[in-house]
Every structure is written in C-alpha cells, then in structure tokens.
Amino acid sequence: MVREAAMLHIKEGLEQEFEDAFRQAAPIISGMKGYITHSLSKCMEETHKYLLLVEWETLEDHTEGFRGSSEYQEWKALLHRFYTPFPTVEHFQDV
C-alpha cells in the first residue's frame, strides 16, 4: 500500500467552491484501479490549506494509471484552477 500526500494551497476566498468541486471530483478518483481510500482535511490555522491523503495499491496505480487516464483530465478540469501554487505530491509507505 502506498499513501499519496498532497498539501493543497487554495486561492483565498475560494475554499467553499473548492470543497464543492472536490465533492464532485471524489467519485472520479474512487473509481480508479488500485484506489483504496482517501481523505481531505482542512487546516485549522490556515483555512485556505488542505491535506489530501490517498491510499493506492501501488505507486504506479497513481503515477501511471490515474495520471495517465482520461479521468485525470476530468479531475484536473474540476480542481487545478483552485491551486496556488501547484501542490507538492509525495508518496509514503508504512514502516
């Protein structure tokens, strides 16, 4: 299992619109091969910051399967306009 972690900085004032768009986008990612689960958490100190955690069966399920898919283009169209700057995405595994 691989855990994807993305720190999302949302343009200030667009937080609610982002959350609504994320609810629309969630079924896209949850239907992908290798997807296990995800969570989106809002920072309490900086309300324009969110932490997205996604669990995948393999790294390639995310980096090749999801990112190389037409579904990723839908995800991107719904969400990428909210990011400033574009998020750093890292992958972790349990030890």
Swiss-Prot record:
Signal peptide: none annotated. PROSITE patterns: ABM. SUPFAM superfamilies: Dimeric alpha+beta barrel. Residues 2-92 form the ABM domain. It holds the Pfam family ABM. InterPro entries: ABM_dom, Dimeric_a/b-barrel. Coiled coil: none annotated. This is Uncharacterized protein YczJ.
